[in-house]
């Protein structure tokens, strides 16, 4: 199935969380927090201003981003756990 987000929404795949701490302690699945970093899979065309002019998004597919803990809506597409969120939920692009 293909999915194309509308307006100023983006589809994000979470990056895998760390299995170990820097000190070498293994973190069990039950203690892991969901990562707040992901990769953009797809972007919508953008939002519109008051005059109806299309405003393109600042992010593109392939960008690695940071987002808030409670950002987005979790969905499952083709067996992949993904997030759909507005561009305004994105905190920044990781360079």
Curated annotation (Swiss-Prot):
Keyword terms of this UniProt record: Chaperone, Cytoplasm
Name under which the protein is recorded: Co-chaperonin GroES
HAMAP family: CH10 (MF_00580)
Cellular compartments annotated: Cytoplasm
Oligomeric form and interacting partners: Heptamer of 7 subunits arranged in a ring. Interacts with the chaperonin GroEL.
InterPro entries, alphabetized: Chaperonin_GroES, Chaperonin_GroES_sf, Chaprnonin_Cpn10_CS, GroES-like_sf
Similarity annotation: Belongs to the GroES chaperonin family.
CDD domains linked to this entry: cpn10 (cd00320)
Gene encoding the protein: groES
Bridged cysteine pairs (disulfide): none
Annotated function: Together with the chaperonin GroEL, plays an essential role in assisting protein folding. The GroEL-GroES system forms a nano-cage that allows encapsulation of the non-native substrate proteins and provides a physical environment optimized to promote and accelerate protein folding. GroES binds to the apical surface of the GroEL ring, thereby capping the opening of the GroEL channel.
NCBIfam families noted in UniProt: PRK00364.1-2, PRK00364.1-5, PRK00364.2-2, PRK00364.2-4, PRK00364.2-5
Primary localisation category: cytoplasm
GO cellular component: cytoplasm
Protein's GO biological process: chaperone cofactor-dependent protein refolding
Alphabetical list of Gene3D superfamilies matching this protein: GroES chaperonin
Entry's Gene Ontology molecular function annotations: ATP binding; metal ion binding; protein folding chaperone; protein-folding chaperone binding; unfolded protein binding
Keyword Disulfide bond: no
């Amino acid at each position: 199935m293909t999915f194309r987000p509308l307006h100023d929404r983006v589809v994000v795949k979470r990056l895998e969380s760390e299995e170990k701490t820097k000190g070498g302690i293994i973190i069990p699945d039950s203690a892991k927090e969901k990562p707040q970093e992901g990769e953009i899979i797809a972007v919508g065309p953008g939002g519109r201003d008051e005059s109806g002019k299309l405003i393109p998004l600042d992010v593109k597919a392939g960008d690695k981003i940071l987002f808030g803990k409670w950002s987005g809506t979790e969905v499952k597409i083709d067996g992949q756990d993904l997030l759909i969120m507005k561009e305004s939920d994105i905190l920044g692009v990781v360079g």
